[in-house]
Every structure is written in structure tokens, then in C-alpha cells.
């Protein structure tokens, strides 16, 4: 999973921390003069402002709302607290979101899909960093190739065309070995959603034993199916950053491939895992909603809750099983991309329990051996409802919703925003009622 930490400390990029401050200025006041005064307060505390946005407020007072993104080099939030205090002394009520273990604040999170650019390159492990026990650790050609592909991913920004990789003959051969072996097992081991979508990927995205599909083609296909998109990444992201991406229906995927010496094994996610394991299910509407539900639960969650969510992700999206009549099939990418795991989960050695996030979140799991325990979902729809109930147990100072039109996270912190949701529900209900009446006619 994309949440592993780097115990060797390799490839870790220097960390910076973020806050977002929200405040309003009265329409009748000197907007420009007032804003400059408040910016000077922030500057005084040696905090960088990375973005400023303004818009007419939706409150009855018709104020101007300002949104400031801040960046600072230390996790210590004392200076941010001083900024809030100084603003309050000026009669300005400011709200902040920031990366902090202080429970007074909610951790910072991306508000727009383009905000994913802020952390996309802050990987825990670079794609070019290989531990001594990695199959390609002593292969200089392979290591250089990993560095090359990681560098390509590092240049990507939201809205760009995903760079296409010119895969070598050896890389395509490795892909083909994995592809052919897994495809033999899919009919008897994979869930019916995977079985339905995989041929569509072959038809629309160039999936075949002789071709490694390009992320841009896959992303285009997913956007048409479920609104999901793929974003290239250099290596392993933190659990928080990876899960936050899911809230925007964005899946961070690697483009490099495992070492050819052991084509049926990889110690970390590679393009075989991402494209053969994860991608097919992201084209299924119910699974797409379920995955986003996990992402939305991570928005503003505490470090402790992020760990619980990561574990639930492991037992669902990575190693989840589901019921299909009297049989049990796999939907987790860690199973669907591993020949050994696909054969193992059907044996008596593997214990299977009904999926319950309140139980799964506290279950330990191995990362280097076959899973001794799997959780079985009744359906993706029910699993989504269970995850929503689980997320409701998290203590957050606000509620949120994802706006698919603006691809942004909205904080539901005033009456007008709630009324907007009510209007949306009413409009959708009217459309539904009209459709039902025409079906009955």
C-alpha cells in the first residue's frame, strides 16, 4: 500500500508544513487596506503565504471572504497561533486548518484538486531508492531506469498530459509474464466487476501481454466511467497524502516495473500492481464511490484516525474479498496482482471474517508474507455505508462534502452552505420524480 514508511530514511524530501487561514472583511471597510494590514501580521511571524484567494461572502452581511495558504518549516504551530491571536485583536475572527498534532486544530488538507501538487513529490520512498534486499539493488542499469522514470513523474502538475513511458523490450517481457499468469487466474478468483471491466481495458486502453498501457489513456477511460483519474507519482506517499487524493477521485500510481529476475514478485507497488490490481475496480461505480468514501474520511482526520483508515484500506482496497452468491471472490489489488495471494486466499490456511471497519481497523497484518486473515464484504454499497458510519466516529470540528462540479472540498460551516445542499437534494428529487412518472406512463 502507498502508506509504508521508509525505515532506512532513504529518499525523504525535507518536510514543510501548511496552514490555511479563513477570515472575512466587511464590505463597507477598506478591503485593500485591511488585507494589507493582516498580511503584515503574518509576515511579522516569518510565515510564507503561498496563495491568496478572495470572493464575495455568501453570508447575509455580504462580506468578502479571504483564504490564505501558509507554509512554514517547522511542525511547531506557535507562530500560527500568534497570528490568529493578533488577528483577533484586530477584530477579525479567523479559522485555521493546519498540519499539527494539536487537537485545537484540524490537520491541513487539500481543498482543490490542484492542491495535490503541493505534496505529490513529498514521497517517503523515491521510486529510485532500493533497499539492499530488493531484487534490483545490485543492478545499476535497473536503478538508473528507476531514477529516470521517477524524474519523469516529478515534473507532473495537475492538468498536464501524463508523460508517456517508452518501455523497453525487457520491461514489456516482464509485464507479459505477470499479465498472462494473472489472466489465467482471474476467471475463477476475481470478482465479477473485475471480470466485466478487464476486457474493456483491453479494448480501450491497450491492455495486452505485449503492451504496457499508458497512464493517460487509462485516466481518460476512468474519467468517462466513474470520474476517477490517475496521477503519476515517484514512489510511496504518506498515508495521509495518499488517502487525501482519493477524496478527489485521484489515484496516485507508479510507472516503473519490477525487476525482471523475479517477475512474479515485487516488494513495493509497481505498474503491474497498479494497472492489473487497482485500475479495473476504479471503473466500477460502486467501488469508485467506496474508495472515495475512504478518502473523504481522511480529510481533516487526526494522525491516529489516519492509521485506522490505512488499516481499513489494507483490508479492503488492497486485500479485500467479497461475496458472490455462495462463493467468495477477490477485489483487493494486492490479491488481484499476486498469483500467490490469489491462490492462497482460497485455501483453508486463510481465515475469513465478515467486514466490519471497527474490527478491521485494529487488526495487525504482515507485509512480506501471505495474509493470514481476510475480511469479506457483503457488497461495495454496504461497505461504503459501513465506512461512512466508521468515519462518523472520528472527532472533527467540521463537516465536509465533495463538490464534483468544482472538484473541491467544501467545509460546511454556515447556514447558506447547508441550504445549498438542500436545494441540490430538492433538484435531484424533482428529476427523480419526473423520471419515475415517465416510466409509469
UniProtKB/Swiss-Prot annotation:
Organism, as annotated: Dictyostelium discoideum
Cofactor: Fe(2+)
Transmembrane regions: none
Enzyme class: oxidoreductase
Record domain ACT: where: 23-102
Keywords recorded for this protein, A-Z: Iron, Metal-binding, Monooxygenase, Oxidoreductase, Phenylalanine catabolism
EC annotation from Swiss-Prot or TrEMBL: 1.14.16.1, 1.14.16.4
Reaction(s) catalysed (UniProt annotation): (6R)-L-erythro-5,6,7,8-tetrahydrobiopterin + L-phenylalanine + O2 = (4aS,6R)-4a-hydroxy-L-erythro-5,6,7,8-tetrahydrobiopterin + L-tyrosine; (6R)-L-erythro-5,6,7,8-tetrahydrobiopterin + L-tryptophan + O2 = 5-hydroxy-L-tryptophan + (4aS,6R)-4a-hydroxy-L-erythro-5,6,7,8-tetrahydrobiopterin
Annotated cofactor note: Binds 1 Fe(2+) ion.
SUPFAM superfamilies (UniProt xref): ACT-like (SSF55021), Aromatic aminoacid monoxygenases, catalytic and oligomerization domains (SSF56534)
Role description: Catalyzes the hydroxylation of L-phenylalanine. Hydroxylates L-tryptophan to 5-hydroxy-L-tryptophan but does not hydroxylate L-tyrosine to L-DOPA. It uses D-threo-tetrahydrodictyopterin (DH4), also known as dictyoperin, as a cofactor.
Name of the protein: Phenylalanine-4-hydroxylase
Binding site for Fe cation: 273, 278, 318
GO biological process entries: asexual reproduction; L-phenylalanine biosynthetic process; L-phenylalanine catabolic process; tyrosine biosynthetic process
Gene responsible for this protein: pah
Record-level Gene Ontology MF annotations: identical protein binding; iron ion binding; phenylalanine 4-monooxygenase activity; prephenate dehydratase activity; tetrahydrobiopterin binding; tryptophan 5-monooxygenase activity
